[in-house]
Amino acid sequence: MQEVPIVILDFGSQYTQLIARRLREVGVYCEIYPFFEPIENIRAKKPQGIILSGGPASVYEPDAPRVDKAIYELGIPVLGICYGMQLITVDFGGQVVRALEHEYGKAKLYFDPIHGKVCPLFEGTKDGQIVWMSHGDKVTELPAGFIRIAHTDNSPYAAIANEEKQIYALQFHPEVSHSQEGQKILENFARKICGITSKWDMGHFAKEQIEKIRQRVGEDKVLCALSGGVDSSVVTALLYEAIGDKLIPVFVDNGLLREGEREKVEYVFKNMLKVPLIVVDAKERFLNALQGITDPEQKRKIIGHTFIEVFEEEAKKHTDVKYLAQGTLYPDVIESVSVKGPSETIKSHHNVGGLPDWMKFELIEPLRELFKDEVRKLGLELGLPREMVYRHPFPGPGLAIRILGEVNEEALDLVRKADTILLEEIKAHGLYEKLWQSFAVLLNVKSVGVMGDKRTYENTVALRIVESSDGMTATFAHIPHDLLELISNRIINEVDGINRVVYDITSKPPGTIEWE
């Protein structure tokens, strides 16, 4: 079992993943587990420190989540954040009550020195720094052996410590960006208090993962579906580095790809990385299956079902395959275990869902310990071009769900050309990597126009350009009007069949990023 320098126990905070990301960004490897993780499992990971996350519960409620008190006896430092602080307070005999006024937002943090010295947790950070509060309960009485190490105007116990037991607790959230020096505080906990000296980065991860893959796969073969997206591209590059020709990467051209997408994928993997890529041309098959279909959900199901059929046929050609590779990421893994307890319904995550029963492959998920930004760094480490690693998310059903109405060659040609112009201009103006997604949608709407002296009655395209950090929420991008005008003029002048361009100014929620 891999050693984990910092174990984070999750009590359901919306910010828990941020704790892990902040620590990893400064080279400290950590993993998240539900608060009820058995103590023997935690001990087996040989952590040098434990962090108790925030959470929505109140510690004085009868069914409030609790931690096994044996974690305090492991002889390693513990840091509680928000709910974690309140839990530590109650576990050691202090008092927590419901606050008359909830405290949400920014506050100034002032240090309370210990024997004339600032607590090591705050070394290298400034007194009076801005921190982010988000709590409805407050500590009113400290447990025996604990002292105050920082306060705010509204929180007399903004940070507390029992230095003898190496237990520290913060009422604020150091993991969120609003806490000015929060990342430094977390780094101090890891480096100065827990004594972690190891530096974790993508170079180390790649070496470790390659060795693990080689040991596990041996002389067997691995099948991998390559879509050209970031995750599947990085999985393919990593596996090829590890096992070479024992990897069977399959790229299915469904005819629903963006301009030049197949060619780019073939160039990168066949020419640059020398990967023996299998390309299946299934354009006709997908378009025939989609004929006459206008309902978006039906489109998705048909595309998914057809992909499985094509992938299954290819898999049957390789009888000695034992493993199937998937690009599962760490957020998927975290979400699959509910903090509400083992009885809660588990949410499954499968990148290649609905595969037939006979395909009894063992799964290999080499990215399951990584966040998306780490996957991108790994891709660069493995030699993938930046353009591929930082490309915008592209939906599995491809352009089919960016065409409202029936999908056919004519519609695909229109949306593909409009999309290409949009992306060319976004890149030329240095905006591409600042945006989450930018694409064109062919609307099932025709309108009257005038071109030259002639009346036209042609198609409408909507431009969808959004900013987001994770795709869960998004806001429409405030693109300069002169750039929108340039894109619109180019599309109308260069793409026969389009005479109107509109800009989608809907955020998510209430809208979704994709139109279908």
Curated annotation (Swiss-Prot):
<feature type="domain" description="Glutamine amidotransferase type-1">
    <location>
        <begin position="5"/>
        <end position="199"/>
    </location>
</feature>
<feature type="active site">
    <location>
        <position position="175"/>
    </location>
</feature>
<keyword id="KW-0332">GMP biosynthesis</keyword>
<feature type="binding site">
    <location>
        <begin position="227"/>
        <end position="233"/>
    </location>
    <ligand>
        <name>ATP</name>
    </ligand>
</feature>
<keyword id="KW-0436">Ligase</keyword>
<dbReference type="InterPro" id="IPR022955">
    <property type="entry name" value="GMP_synthase"/>
</dbReference>
<dbReference type="Pfam" id="PF00117">
    <property type="entry name" value="GATase"/>
</dbReference>
<keyword id="KW-0315">Glutamine amidotransferase</keyword>
<dbReference type="InterPro" id="IPR004739">
    <property type="entry name" value="GMP_synth_GATase"/>
</dbReference>
<dbReference type="GO" id="GO:0005829">
    <property type="term" value="C:cytosol"/>
</dbReference>
<feature type="active site">
    <location>
        <position position="173"/>
    </location>
</feature>
<comment type="pathway">
    <text>Purine metabolism; GMP biosynthesis; GMP from XMP (L-Gln route): step 1/1.</text>
</comment>
<protein>
    <recommendedName>
        <fullName>GMP synthase [glutamine-hydrolyzing]</fullName>
        <ecNumber>6.3.5.2</ecNumber>
    </recommendedName>
</protein>
<dbReference type="InterPro" id="IPR029062">
    <property type="entry name" value="Class_I_gatase-like"/>
</dbReference>
<dbReference type="InterPro" id="IPR014729">
    <property type="entry name" value="Rossmann-like_a/b/a_fold"/>
</dbReference>
<dbReference type="InterPro" id="IPR001674">
    <property type="entry name" value="GMP_synth_C"/>
</dbReference>
<comment type="subunit">
    <text>Homodimer.</text>
</comment>
<feature type="domain" description="GMPS ATP-PPase">
    <location>
        <begin position="200"/>
        <end position="391"/>
    </location>
</feature>
<dbReference type="InterPro" id="IPR025777">
    <property type="entry name" value="GMPS_ATP_PPase_dom"/>
</dbReference>
<keyword id="KW-0067">ATP-binding</keyword>
<dbReference type="GO" id="GO:0003921">
    <property type="term" value="F:GMP synthase activity"/>
</dbReference>
<keyword id="KW-0658">Purine biosynthesis</keyword>
<feature type="active site" description="Nucleophile">
    <location>
        <position position="82"/>
    </location>
</feature>
<dbReference type="Pfam" id="PF00958">
    <property type="entry name" value="GMP_synt_C"/>
</dbReference>
<dbReference type="GO" id="GO:0005524">
    <property type="term" value="F:ATP binding"/>
</dbReference>
<comment type="function">
    <text>Catalyzes the synthesis of GMP from XMP.</text>
</comment>
<dbReference type="InterPro" id="IPR017926">
    <property type="entry name" value="GATASE"/>
</dbReference>
<keyword id="KW-0547">Nucleotide-binding</keyword>
